């Protein structure tokens, strides 16, 4: 048996990428839709979170889904996994604690996932007992430090801090947090906040809602998130109304930011902006200028748009945006805008671009070739590129050595239809599935990158020979139903520097059998934790 510690395997792993330095502008975002057809347990996403390791965790009704960058897996709770919370009236709320647990609250109940095993905890009560807490738990919270707090009766207990605070009898405790590791804040359903010294437990101050009408109007649910020297709070009404407020810890005053005639569902910060999911798309609040922007239509591929509610909105470690909807799937927008613009034949722009392309096509574009050749292109170096049924052929000198580029070199498809050279003398080819970019440096092809339907490239064949470089540096290619236009200089990968990666292994097979934690294979346990958390893998060898 061999023990492999601190694995650095890439061929066996599905990788999650690290932080990128390029960000998509909000108006340029294009979304990809994931749903049950992609492996999710359902077509709606109630909550979405990015773990510290970079993995996405999505709750659908009755399930927890994990996404590893290429596929979904989900786990299902059993009846005995559910713990009743008599004082929680809200909807789905996902929380992480400091003990590698994921907690999911929803309407008077909570479940717990052990992230080290990626399984539901059999009995939630056992977690409380392990933390030394034996009283019944009526509601559960986590603070900014991921410390657990349990409401039992009229007392809030810190399961990690070992502190306790009396709560008001005349108001519903809806949220809590800790400011600057020294002030305990209790947020109530009537819009008030009470502050206590975290260490001594002494009362510091209380601030109520601005008016009694406001206090009663938005009493249905509360969601609080820290920002600098204060807290943003969403308060929803039983009717379709909501208010966003900010509490300044220095002035100890509330400020109303916005009120809407529908529910606000989530908050996330990115690039000095506050993003809020709502019943009609999402809002962006500029924290520097106080400007507000409402995004009601979400752009999809092929010039389509979606109007939907947004239950949850988060950003991953790369800066990609994830949106959870009630019934229309999980939406993802890349951290950089798609450079591909497509125009269908019913769009007047398609005729415009066809005419521009037609004027700049080489004479070889119009020739009819016999199989297995679709097109031949001569670049500025005198190299001859041949688009074939079986790949892309390069001949640098007549009668010289030939090089064939296929799927093993980075093409997604080997039926090549058209070829064009950009202003920097790189080569772009259109295939029956995707557009590929061949980077050329020091008189050689250094790498190949391919773009497909997820990048807004039409998922269809392209027309033989129909590709041209325009005078402004853009490239036009013709597919069966679209004109595709893009600027090579707008691509995030034009920089030669590599982005930092944060690989995470999520699956391993032994003799074709998927390995699970604590599951024996040929008489011994290979991993004792979930693959994504494993630091040792034990396998037999000859």
Predicted region positions:
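Short loop/turn segments that connect beta-strands within beta-propeller blades
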Residues: 68-71, 78, 114-118, 159-163, ...
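Residue-level "micro-hotspots" composed of small/polar
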Residues: 24-52, 56, 70, 77-91, ...
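Asp-box/WD-like beta-propeller blade repeats and closely related beta-sheet repeat scaffolds
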Residues: 109, 117-139
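Residue-level detector of Asp-centered blade-edge/turn motifs that repeat once per structural unit
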Residues: 50-53, 96-99, 142-145, 178-181, ...
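Bacterial Sec-dependent N-terminal signal peptides
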Residues: 1-30, 320, 383
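Loop/turn residues immediately N-terminal
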Residues: 62-65, 70, 107-111, 153-157, ...
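Solenoidal tandem-repeat scaffolds enriched in leucines and small polar residues
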Residues: 138-139, 148-157, 168-180, 184-192, ...
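Conserved beta-propeller blade signature
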Residues: 55-57, 101-103, 147-149, 183-186, ...
């Amino acid at each position: 048996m061999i023990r492999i510690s601190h694995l650095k395997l890439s061929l066996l792993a599905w990788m999650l990428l690290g932080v990128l330095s390029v960000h998509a502008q909000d108006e340029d975002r294009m979304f990809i839709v994931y749903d049950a057809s992609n492996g999710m347990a359902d077509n709606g996403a109630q909550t979405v979170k990015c773990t510290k390791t970079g993995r996405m965790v999505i709750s659908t009704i009755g399930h927890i889904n994990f996404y590893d960058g290429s596929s979904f897996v989900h786990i299902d709770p059993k009846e005995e996994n559910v713990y009743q919370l008599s004082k929680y009236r809200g909807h789905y709320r996902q929380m992480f604690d400091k003990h590698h647990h994921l907690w999911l609250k929803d309407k008077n109940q909570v479940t717990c996932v052990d992230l080290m095993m990626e399984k539901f905890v059999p009995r939630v009560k056992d977690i409380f007992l392990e933390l030394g807490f034996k009283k019944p738990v009526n509601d559960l919270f986590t603070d900014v430090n991921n410390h657990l707090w349990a409401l039992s009766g009229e007392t809030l207990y810190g399961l990690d801090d070992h502190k306790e605070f009396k709560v008001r009898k005349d108001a519903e405790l809806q949220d809590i947090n800790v400011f600057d590791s020294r002030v305990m804040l209790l947020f109530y359903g009537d819009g008030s906040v009470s502050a206590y010294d975290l260490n001594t437990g002494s009362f510091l101050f209380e601030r109520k809602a601005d008016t009694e009408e406001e206090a009663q109007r938005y009493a249905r649910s509360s969601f609080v998130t820290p920002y600098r020297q204060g807290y943003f709070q969403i308060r929803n009404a039983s009717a379709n109304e909501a208010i966003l407020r900010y509490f300044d810890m220095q002035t100890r005053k509330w400020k109303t930011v916005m009120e809407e005639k529908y529910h606000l569902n989530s908050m996330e910060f990115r690039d000095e902006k506050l993003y809020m999911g709502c019943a009609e798309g999402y809002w962006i609040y500029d924290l520097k200028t106080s400007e507000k922007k409402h995004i009601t239509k979400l752009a999809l591929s092929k010039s389509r748009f979606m109007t939907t509610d947004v239950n949850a909105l988060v950003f991953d470690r790369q800066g990609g945006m994830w949106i959870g909807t009630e019934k229309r799937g999980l939406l993802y927008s890349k951290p950089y805008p798609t450079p591909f613009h497509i125009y269908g034949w019913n769009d007047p722009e398609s005729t415009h671009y066809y005419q521009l392309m037609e004027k700049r096509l080489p004479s070889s574009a119009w020739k009819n070739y016999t199989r297995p050749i679709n097109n031949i292109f001569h670049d500025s170096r005198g190299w001859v590129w041949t688009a074939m049924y079986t790949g892309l052929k390069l001949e640098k000198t007549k009668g010289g050595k030939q090089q064939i580029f296929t799927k093993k070199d980075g093409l997604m498809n080997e039926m090549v239809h058209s070829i064009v050279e950009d202003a920097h003398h790189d080569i772009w080819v259109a295939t029956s599935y995707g557009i590929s970019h061949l980077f050329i440096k020091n008189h050689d092809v250094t790498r190949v990158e391919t773009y497909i339907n997820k990048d807004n490239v039409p998922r269809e064949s392209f027309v033989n020979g129909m590709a041209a470089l325009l005078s402004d540096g853009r490239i036009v290619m013709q597919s069966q139903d679209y004109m595709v236009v893009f600027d090579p200089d707008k691509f995030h990968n034009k920089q030669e520097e590599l982005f930092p990666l944060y690989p995470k292994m999520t699956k391993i097979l032994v003799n074709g059998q998927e390995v699970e934690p604590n599951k024996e294979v040929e008489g011994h346990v290979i991993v004792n934790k979930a693959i994504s958390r494993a630091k040792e893998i034990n396998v037999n060898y000859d």
